Regions:
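Short, glycine-/small- and polar/acidic-enriched structural segments
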Residues: 24-150, 156-159, 175, 181, ...
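Short, solvent-exposed loop/beta-turn-alpha elements that line the ligand-binding surface or hinge
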Residues: 49-53, 207-216, 283-291
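Sec/Tat-exported extracytoplasmic proteins
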Residues: 75, 80, 90, 131, ...
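Pocket-lining segment of extracytoplasmic ligand-binding domains
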Residues: 84-85, 164-261
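Secondary-structure end/capping motifs
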Residues: 230-304
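Conserved C-terminal helix/tail region of periplasmic/extracytoplasmic solute-binding proteins
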Residues: 295-320
């Protein structure tokens, strides 16, 4: 190779060294929540078509405060969240919309006393739960109001996270815990090891349907997204939607393998995750295809407390 060729090659290699973006995959960051639907995000990130063209990164937020701070700072452009959070953000002037619903309800009441089988049975009992004024609390309050149960007569103790609620429920004298999957399944397994007989007293989606005369369906949580980011990447999000649908199908057909993946992201052992998939009402449905169901759900929340939605009902254009 002559001197001119050598210098040309050196220049080309030097340019490549200082321009890694020419070779690197584009980033696709998604934040999950500390609950079972994040397993779908994990499987899709590992196995999906989008993984072939993008550098997928999944992280889990641990509390609603972290979620809100991440969205406000711009760090979280795509994140799993309770469905009302996207509406609340939009009504505060933050340009977010609801991309999909990933569970039709994964909350239940776990109990030590087998006689607790209904919301009415919680009156006079000690209940522990996470996330005051967020979705678990909202759902319980809406059900109590509809059924005429005085929630002030339930001794409720609030904690910051689902694992904390489960730990205190097992160790202290609480009669019941409002929990989400996979923590409910984890509590049952941990209870057996500790000699504490824990069972599911009742499923909140079933009580919701019974109370409001509808299907046992709570469009509880899904992905919310920065609308400008979504509009600039619609084709990418279509691929991701299909990846999530395929991930759900694979999870239900391969529960043990899915549990191994989920356990890398969620604070629950593999057996608990494997047991939780079937009773978590998992789905992957675009928000715009659930407009009527979402509006009906948000009407209940608005009647309970308009602040839960940021002061007003959502515009249907928020459902992407």
């Amino acid at each position: 190779m002559n001197r001119r060729g050598f210098l040309g090659l050196g220049a080309a290699l030097g340019a490549t060294a200082f321009a890694p973006n020419l070779l690197a995959k584009e980033r696709f960051d998604v934040w999950g929540m500390p609950a079972i639907p994040s397993t779908m995000l994990a499987v899709a990130s590992l196995q999906g078509e989008l993984n072939k063209t993008h550098d997928m990164k999944l992280r889990i937020w641990n509390s609603p405060d972290q979620l809100r701070a991440g969205v406000a700072s711009g760090e979280m452009k795509l994140t799993a969240a309770p469905s009302n959070v996207g509406v609340n953000l939009a009504n505060q002037g933050i340009n977010f919309g609801l991309l999909n619903i990933m569970t039709n309800g994964l909350q239940n009441i776990i109990v030590k006393d087998p006689n607790i089988k209904s919301v009415e049975d919680l009156v006079g009992k000690k209940l522990i739960m996470p996330f005051k004024n967020d979705m678990p609390d909202i759902v319980l309050r809406a059900i109590c109001k509809k059924r005429g149960v005085d929630i002030s007569k339930i001794e409720i103790n609030y904690v910051q996270t689902p694992p904390e609620a489960i730990g205190l429920f097992l160790q202290k004298d609480f009669d019941a815990a409002l929990s989400i999957e996979p923590m409910s399944s984890a509590a049952i397994l941990r209870g057996k090891k500790m000699g504490v007989n824990v069972r599911v007293g009742f499923e909140l989606p079933e009580v919701w349907g019974e109370s409001f005369g509808i299907k046992p369906y709570i469009p509880q949580a899904g992905l919310i997204v920065d609308i400008d980011y979504y509009n600039a990447n619609k084709e990418v999000f279509e691929i991701f939607h299909k990846d999530l649908q395929n991930a759900l199908k694979w999870i239900l057909e391969n529960k043990q393998s899915a549990a191994q993946i989920g356990a890398q992201y969620l604070p629950a052992p593999e057996p608990a995750l494997a047991n939780a998939f079937e009773r978590s009402n998992l789905t992957v449905t675009k928000a715009k295809d659930l407009t009527d169901e979402l509006m009906s759900f948000f009407e209940v929340l608005f009647e309970l407390n308009p602040k839960l939605l940021g002061g007003k009902m959502p515009d249907k254009s928020l459902f992407l």
